[in-house]
Swiss-Prot record:
Binding site for Mg(2+) 2: 158, 162
GO CC annotation, single: cytoplasm
Reaction(s) catalysed by this chain's protein: isopentenyl diphosphate + (2E)-geranyl diphosphate = (2E,6E)-farnesyl diphosphate + diphosphate
Keywords on record: Isoprene biosynthesis, Magnesium, Metal-binding, Transferase
EC identifiers of the protein: 2.5.1.10
TM regions (residue ranges): none
Organism per entry: Murgantia histrionica (Harlequin bug)
Protein name: Farnesyl pyrophosphate synthase
Annotated GO biological process: farnesyl diphosphate biosynthetic process; isoprenoid biosynthetic process; pheromone biosynthetic process
Length: 405
């Protein structure tokens, strides 16, 4: 299979080609020495980034201030009102109201809430000073919770489909007593609640139609990505291609994780210019790809306690960045082990797969990808129009760099 079919986001093609051409023969020390060189010259050929030459992997922009603890506290303070809005519509059906409240508490209020907080932070960065009223900040927080509800919806469905064990350090929702397959119906309660809140709080706003279309588009695209993810698992080795992975990542992760929160804030801030939305989307989809590659890496090599869930990609035979690169770089004996062990639930076989990942120096390859991707996206941000504050996008990018959970 030609390399161009096995690369990561085309953003990092030349970097990955350099390392993949080692064919697994170079020891980790040689790889590390290569990483220390400042003489690399790569050409980026991302579908979202104009091709340009990069002289070095150093000299990134100054990292700006990020979301504060006060922002997180204020965001959480709105959550009880969100739950009340959702439960008051059915005052005569106490069982349903109780279930919705429990659903929200268990599946929406936890986690890092990065997507929801991104809506608020983005609005503060994008809106003119006169629009930063307490009422508008509160509305941005409500819309942030709408994004978090979509996240909760996808989490419940994904955990059920993957038969995951834990999420955020607790048993997955479907594993709670009395839930089981009902989790699919419960997830729909969260999804419908998201659109209920949009209607309740935004139907008289100029941006309401754009906002609903944005959420529906994110929902549709993410569903496409989730579905393709489910049907792309090993042992069908023809599914382990980077073209397929790029599609899954773009649709399953990038749209609702990065594009949706920022585009929501843009509409709320009165930014309708199609070119500005195109530029923002271009950067945000690249961040989403970067985010998913990180997730794939952390699923295998991350700290389970810090992440809050047990990695399952190997036993599920997922189409992941690590798996694709491993099959590309593996020697015939290594490939034979991967084909016999990848996608099985036996602990000793899972360990064999992970051992081969290490033999192939995939942690070092990943860190090289991360360093180069961070710098290339930084340069793309620096090319954005003045109507898009660079600090906003640099902050989001910096939150990604080197994350451990």
């Amino acid at each position: 299979m030609p390399f161009t079919k096995m690369c990561t986001s085309k953003l990092a093609n030349p970097l990955m080609k350099y390392y993949l051409n080692l064919n697994g023969k170079s020891p980790l020390s040689k790889l590390s020495n290569s990483l220390n060189s400042s003489s690399f010259k790569f050409i980026s050929c991302s579908p979202h980034i104009v091709c340009r030459e990069l002289n070095t992997v150093s000299g990134v922009a100054i990292r700006p201030q990020t979301i504060t603890k006060d922002d997180k506290r204020d965001f959480m303070a709105v959550f009880p009102d969100i739950v009340r809005d959702l439960t008051q519509l059915n005052p005569g059906i106490s069982d349903l109201s109780t279930l919705i409240s429990k659903l929200m508490q268990y599946n929406v209020s936890g986690g890092k809430k990065v997507r929801g907080l991104t809506v608020v932070y983005s609005y503060r960065m994008l809106a003119p000073d006169h629009a930063l009223t307490p009422e508008n900040i509160r509305l941005a927080q409500i819309l942030g919770w709408c994004v978090e509800m979509l996240q909760g919806f996808f989490v419940v469905i994904d955990d059920l489909a993957d038969q995951s064990v834990t999420r955020r350090g607790r048993p997955c929702w479907y594993r709670l007593p009395g839930v089981g397959l009902r989790a699919s119906s419960d997830a729909l309660l969260i999804q419908s609640g998201c659109f209920q809140l949009l209607q309740q709080h935004c139907k008289d706003k100029e941006f309401y139609v754009d906002l609903v279309e944005l959420f529906l588009d994110a929902l549709r695209r993410t569903t496409y990505g989730q579905t393709l993810d489910y049907v792309s698992s090993f042992p069908n080795i023809n599914h382990l291609t980077m073209d397929r992975y790029n599609f899954i990542t773009k649709y399953k992760t990038a749209y609702y994780t990065y594009h949706l929160p920022v585009a929501t804030a843009m509409y709320m801030a009165g930014i309708y210019n199609a070119e500005l939305h195109r530029q923002a989307k271009s950067v945000l989809l690249e961040m989403g790809h970067y985010f998913q590659v990180q997730d794939d890496y952390l699923d295998v090599f991350g700290d389970e306690e810090m992440i809050g869930k047990k990695g399952t990609d190997i036993q599920e035979g997922k189409c992941t960045w690590l798996a694709i690169i491993a099959f590309q770089r593996a020697s015939p004996p290594q490939r034979e082990v991967l084909e016999s062990c990848y996608g099985t639930k036996e602990p000793e076989k899972i360990k064999k797969v992970k051992d081969i990942f290490i033999e192939l120096s995939l942690p070092a390859v990943y860190h090289a990808y991360e360093e180069e991707t961070y710098n290339l996206i930084t340069r793309q941000i620096q090319q954005l129009s003045q109507g898009l504050p660079h600090e906003l996008f640099l902050t989001l990018l910096h939150k990604l760099y080197g994350r451990k959970q």
